[in-house]
C-alpha cells in the first residue's frame, strides 16, 4: 500500500510548491518523541518581533516582542497585530505576487524586489513584516508562499538583519499541517491561512458543518497544532522555537541552483526543476481559478465542489495510481489461475506505464543475453524474497497464516510484524508446512516478545521505523484486540495497544548495539536485522548500525507501508527507496562495511523489474480500500470482525504462485542481462541506464511535463564507489559471544539439561 502516486516532479499535473518537500525524522541516533503521551514537554509558544542588537547588554530594545501561544493566527489576531499602537511595534504588509504575463522573469523579479523591500522595511524600523498574497488578481498570480518566505528569510540572514523582524505569512495557499510545518521550518514566525477560514465560514453558513464558526475555526487550529506537534516529535524536537528555521526537510525534484539561491542549501539528490516550471505551474493554477470565476459569472451558476482527483483512492481521470482496478484484478486472476502469461500482462501494466510514477520507471537494464538455462533456477531465486512486516492484529488470522505457509513452502521468509505470534504456530503444521514465521519482529511496544518467541526465529528484526509513518509508532485499536490477539500480545481484550515512536531502550547507536547483543544471546543462531526508513543521511545511520553488529539492514521506502498510516505521513514523510538504498550502498562500500551486512529494500516492489515485497497482500484478496485500521476490510484481510473474516478468499497457494512468477521473471531478466545469479548484479549500478523518451513524448505528455522529466539527474543515484572492496555481504559479524556468562552457565549445566 502506501503512497502509489507520482512524485511532484514526475506528475503531469501542475503542483503546488509544498509537494516537492518531504519531512525528515529521527531514527537510531536520537529518539523521536511521543507527542501525545509526552505532551508535557511539547510547546508551540513563540516570542516574535525584534531581538535587540545588544544581547550582551540587555535593555528595553530586547522587549519589543509579542508572545504567541501557537503560530496559527486568526484573521482577527492578525488585524490586531497590524494595528498595535505601542511605541516600537511597527507592521508592514508586502505583497507576494508576480505578473502573470512575465512568467519566470516576472517571478524572479518579484522575488528580488520582495527581498530588497523586506531589507528596506527592517531599516525603516518595521519589526513585523507580513508577506501577503491577498492582492492576487487576474493579472497577478501568487508567489508560492514557501518560496517567498524562504527567499526573504535567507536574504535577511545574508545581510545580518533577520533577528530584527518577524516574518508572518498571510496566504490562501495554506491548508494542511505540512504546509504550516514547511513555512515555519523555512523561517516564518507565524501564519494566517485566510482562505481556509473563508471556506470554513462558507461551510458553516451552508450547514455543511454542524458547528458555529468560532468552534469550527478553533477545531481547525487545534488539528493544525496536533499535527505540528507530531511532525516536530518525529525529529525529536519538543519546542517550536527549536523547529523554526531549522529546515528539517528534504527537497525531491528541485534543482541545486534553486535550492542554493532561495533555500540556503545545494543538496539535491536527483536534481529537478527551477523557477521556469514553478512559475508555469503557479500560472496554470491561477488561470484555472480565474477561468472558473469567469464561467460562474457568465452562467450564473456557482461551482460548489472541486474535482475529486483521488489522492488516496483511485478515480477515473484522476491522479495516476500504481495500484488501480486493472492491475489489482489482473494480478489476482493470474495468481488464482496459476497463469504466468496473465502475470506477464500484469507486469507489463505495472512496468510499461503510460507515464512514470516512481524513479525506477526512468531506468532500464543493459542487455547482453545468455541462454536462460545457464541462469540459476527459480527455486533458488525465490529464496531472496521476503514479505513485509504485517502484524497479527492488523491482519486477520487467516491472512497472516497464509503468508507464513507460502513463504515456508518456498524456503523464503515471512515476517510476524510487531504483534507477536501465537505460540501454537511454532509447533503446528498444515499440509506438512510450518505455520511459524521465520522472521520475528521486535518493535517499540515489544508485544508478544518472549524468550520462546525469539528462540523460534531464524531472523530477529528490530523495527526502528516504518516506511509509511516514520517516527510515529503505531496503535492497534481496542475493537481489533480480541481474545486471541490479546493472548498473543500479553494484553487484555478491548484495550488499545500503543507502540511508542521510540524504543525507550534505544536512544543511541550504543543502545542499539546492546539490544542486538542481548537478542543474539537469546538466540545465537538467528540473524539480527534492523529496519530503517529511507531519508537523506540514512547511509551514515546504516554505517553505525553495521558497527553495532547488525547482520542485515532493511531500507524501507516511503511508497511502501500500511493502509493505517496517517494521510499526511503517507504523502510527506520518507523518500523513495531507490534514493535510500543507493546512499546506503555507497556509504557502506566507501567505508569498507558492505561485506559485513546484507541489505534489503521495500516499497511498492510489484514485478520482477521492481523485485521483492509489497504486492503479497494484493494476491490474498486486498482491493486497496485503505481501511486497514477501521476493522472494516471487506475482503477479510485486515480485520478481526468474524463476519468480515468469513469473506476471506485468499489461499497460500496464491502467494506461492505470485513469488514463483516473480522469480521466473527475475530469471528472464538475468538471462537478458547476461548474468547467471542474482548475487552477480548486486551493487553493479553500471548495469542501469536511463530510458530514452519516445520520439512523440512532447506530443503525448506536453512540453512542460517533458521539461520536468529532463531536469532530473540520476548520476548521484547510480554512482558506484571504486576501490578494492566488496559490493555485497561476504563475511559474518563477530557478535563477541565467546566467554559471555550465559555461555559459561549453559556449559556448566549441560549435563543436567540433557539428562532432564
Model regions and ranges:
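Glycine-rich phosphate/ribose-binding loops and adjacent secondary-structure elements
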Residues: 90-240, 250, 255, 259-261, ...
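Helix-loop-beta element that forms the nucleotide-linked donor phosphate-binding surface
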Residues: 447, 494-496
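Flexible, glycine-rich loop/tail regions that form catalytic "lids" or insertion modules at the edges
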Residues: 1-108, 117-121, 125-128, 179-180, ...
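Broad structural signal for hydrophobic residues in well-ordered alpha-helices, predominantly aliphatic
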Residues: 407, 519-520, 670
